[in-house]
Amino acid sequence: MAAVGASATLLTNTKSAEEPVRPVANFPPSVWGDLFLSFSLDNSMMEEYAEAMEEPKGQVRKLILDPTMDSNKKLSLIYTVHRLGLTYMFFKEIEGQLDRLFKEFNLEDYVEVDLYTISTNFQAFRHLGYKLSCDVFNKFKNYDSNTFKESITSDVRGMLGLYESAQLRLKGEKILDEASAFTETKLKSLVKTLEGSLAQQVKQSLKRPFHQGMPMVEARLYFSNYQEECSRHDSLLKLAKLHFNYLQLQQKEELRIVSQWWKDMRFQETTPYIRDRVPEIYLWILGLYFEPRYSLARIIATKITLFLVVLDDTYDAYATIEEVRLLTDAINRWDIGAMSQIPEYIRPFYKILLDEYAELEKQLAKEGRANSVIASKEAFQDIARGYLEEAEWTNSGYVASFPEYMKNGLITSAYNVISKSALVGMGEIVSEDALAWYESHPQILQASELISRLQDDVMTYQFERERGQSATGVDAYIKTYGVSEKEAIDELKKMIENAWKEINEGCLKPREVSMDLLAPILNLARMIDVVYRYDDGFTFPGKTLKEYITLLFVGSSPM
């Protein structure tokens, strides 16, 4: 399998009963080695950063609450705070301001306002859950031809803002569908003529719009550009840099902890065929929530996802069909007594898996929150059964229909395991009601799950074919609907695009649950985009993920 949660490949032919022929994956080794094991947390430095943040934090709070500030400037400030990853620090203040500004909104007030300002205001509202009408962009279209005015192409900042705004579109917002295509084409043609910070911003946005990027990385990239702006608030820039450096120390310590745990578990010795991807998995989980209060949650979710990598690569790159059947049965039983029935090489993993979950359940039972651990465990059992089904398909040469593939493929995408495991350490916000909402499989969750499956398939299907993997969504779509490969990929991309619109809708007020619970769902879709937009970034992490890990964990932000 090329990705965490992709389809499994199992060879069943053997040379003899004692010497099975196994798949050969030849996964690239870790590019990091033991680099992050050597980190030593300087608590005094963290305290210094925390203390140093207090003054600029107070100054930024005053700016947000300033009653004399023009509404456009206020929305620009709020948008910048959000881009810098600081919204959680001022959530109540920002929500109070946006409540007031949204109630006061009048389309007529925007008649003389420029495209850049309107785009900034639109994003400030939409990113934070307020459904500002896309009619604010109507004035930039020709009424006779219903096309965008060519005059806006001279306003590069405005076009960039419109392009970013279009990523927040909902179903039926045709003007934003058109805006996305129009601005992308124009910006691509102009980018080579631009210079300085603006050129960098356009390149970054075309590569990956902010809305589909990893929040921590986007914040780091944004303050590098923000410091070049003449209208910047120095207190906000200072806070952003201190905040980044503070988080970096905390997160490097978390990465050291999970790296040491991985080494102590000796998985690379007992299951040497697996991918060694500790920093990459930690990065993935960090993409779900970066706030300091979720430190324990990140450590727990990283460990569980690393368990998933071992399981996945065992099904995909080592085990025979007979061994997979035995392992699946053992995971369904979830009983140490089942260890004798599974191959010896996977027994250490099985014991550690059961022990870690038992310890987690014991710890959270004291807080009355063991149900989140149980939900994670059940998701782990589900994915084992899903992997087995794909293995049986591969073993028999069966290509599933697209609906049949998707029913199982949404399970084997690993989305359910990762998303439910992300809840385990989040604390009191994961109440019984919150878990019940999650288990109801709401539309936003379905949409994020679909992106996880299909984005992976679109990027990895060729590699999967070359390795003799079971059929992907691309293959299933071709078989079911009798279309060409290109047509199948185009249709899957449309499904992904529509799923993003459903996620956008699900994040708007009124919400069924708090944004604290919605954010990991949104951010997991974002991380799928990060990992699979241009390549299989997990199996071959030497490009995007290496760049991100270097940016976040190697070297601090210059003050």
From Swiss-Prot:
Pathway: Secondary metabolite biosynthesis; terpenoid biosynthesis. Keywords: Lyase, Magnesium, Metal-binding. Mainly expressed in sunflower trichomes. Mg(2+) 1 binds at D312, D316. Its EC number is 4.2.3.23. The keyword Metal-binding applies. Binds 3 Mg(2+) ions per subunit. GO terms for molecular function: germacrene-A synthase activity; magnesium ion binding. Mg(2+) 2 binds at D312, D316. Sesquiterpene synthase involved in germacrene A biosynthesis. Germacrene A is a precursor of several sesquiterpene lactones. Monomer. This is Germacrene A synthase 2. It comes from Helianthus annuus.
